[in-house]
Amino acid sequence: MRYTKSEEAMKVAETLMPGGVNSPVRAFKSVDTPAIFMDHGKGSKIYDIDGNEYIDYVLSWGPLILGHRDPQVISHLHEAIDKGTSFGASTLLENKLAQLVIDRVPSIEKVRMVSSGTEATLDTLRLARGYTGRNKIVKFEGCYHGHSDSLLIKAGSGVATLGLPDSPGVPEGIAKNTITVPYNDLDALKIAFEKFGDDIAGVIVEPVAGNMGVVPPIEGFLQGLRNITTEYGALLIFDEVMTGFRVGYHCAQGYFGVTPDLTCLGKVIGGGLPVGAFGGKKEIMDHIAPLGNIYQAGTLSGNPLAMTSGYETLSQLTPETYEYFNMLGDILEDGLKRVFAKHNVPITVNRAGSMIGYFLNEGPVTNFEQANKSDLKLFAEMYREMAKEGVFLPPSQFEGTFLSTAHTKEDIEKTIQAFDTALSRIVK
């Protein structure tokens, strides 16, 4: 494949934007390949400015659960645009999407719309602290909750130590109120609560860790979180920005049967437009302004275009949708295992609904330490070869791949064949 136009575009972009991008992963640095500039998408396919076609498993990092340019979504967006892009006042569209979210997400009795997943998690932590009157938040190693200061925190030395900044610019004073423990480790969480329980406002977790390459919870982990937070009077917060409506019809909390106090949403609920949301029990949500004294606001929150795209996306999802995803996922997982075994290359495949992660190691992968044992050099080689075969994968080992309703069995079979061809070139 030729990337001449993309390479030329990147040279210009680098003079205009830091690293030439507006989000770091788009620079493709971890796979040592030129950034690809996209032109358009249709269904399960995406096309770059050089005219190359790819089967798309990135799907804008998850939001496009119906694939690109879904006709129903696009048609209603045209209607919404004709009425205006934003009004700074409420619209009926907000009621429609809010009701749909409340109907489908077990924990949500009231919801507040925002403009991004990061905004949703940031506001949720403020609400948790304001509601409980406590300061500290527990998060898990390898889970990503957006780029707000209090969540860009890595673990300190030892179990349940106070956090240290994970990026320059994050003050240590903020970091000290975030505790990081290993994912899928209830014993570590218990130690954290034994030390700091009286000042822990909440525990935030991706119910399926999608930002270390798709790592599901082990048996009993989520219920254990529910039990421990209840015991200490802390709030359990599910960050379902990625898992929301991808793991199941009632999100990950419905799939696993564990109900948090608060839930963060994003990605799928905007259908490709900028949106986020957070919600939970009425008694907690009513502490948000204007009913309560915990402040939150946003110029474009609940804007009519995002509400339209979100509603028209979610309204097309049914329980049968997830049966279709499971069928495609079964074929892809079986094919990956077969092809990698053929070439004597170890692989671990993790799945959760329409989210799939693969690690180039023996496995299992249940936490960040194990995810880090994947062969990153081989992953980068694999990425480059798969792009040549017309398959667009996330350019990072620590991002999940996604399925859409637009993907077909033929797409999956072509993808499996592409892996076989790629491995034939890599493994000598």
From Swiss-Prot:
EC number, as in UniProt: 5.4.3.8
Work out whether the entry's keyword set contains Metal-binding.
Answer: no
> Where is it mostly found?
cytoplasm
Under which pathway is this protein filed? Porphyrin-containing compound metabolism; protoporphyrin-IX biosynthesis; 5-aminolevulinate from L-glutamyl-tRNA(Glu): step 2/2
Q: Which reaction does it catalyse?
A: (S)-4-amino-5-oxopentanoate = 5-aminolevulinate
Q: Name one GO biological process term.
A: protoporphyrinogen IX biosynthetic process
- Any single Pfam family the record assigns to this protein: Aminotran_3
- What's the cofactor? pyridoxal 5'-phosphate
Note whether Isomerase occurs among the keywords.
yes
Q: Which residues carry this modification: N6-(pyridoxal phosphate)lysine?
A: 267
Question: A cellular component term (GO) from this record?
Answer: cytoplasm
Q: Name one GO molecular function term.
A: pyridoxal phosphate binding
Compartment list: Cytoplasm
Keywords on this record? Cytoplasm, Isomerase, Porphyrin biosynthesis, Pyridoxal phosphate
By sequence similarity, the record places it as follows: Belongs to the class-III pyridoxal-phosphate-dependent aminotransferase family. HemL subfamily.
Query: What binding partners and quaternary form does the record give?
Result: Homodimer.
> What name does the UniProt record give this protein?
Glutamate-1-semialdehyde 2,1-aminomutase 1
Q: What is the organism of origin for this protein?
A: Staphylococcus aureus (strain MSSA476)
The organism's lineage? Bacteria, Bacillati, Bacillota, Bacilli, Bacillales
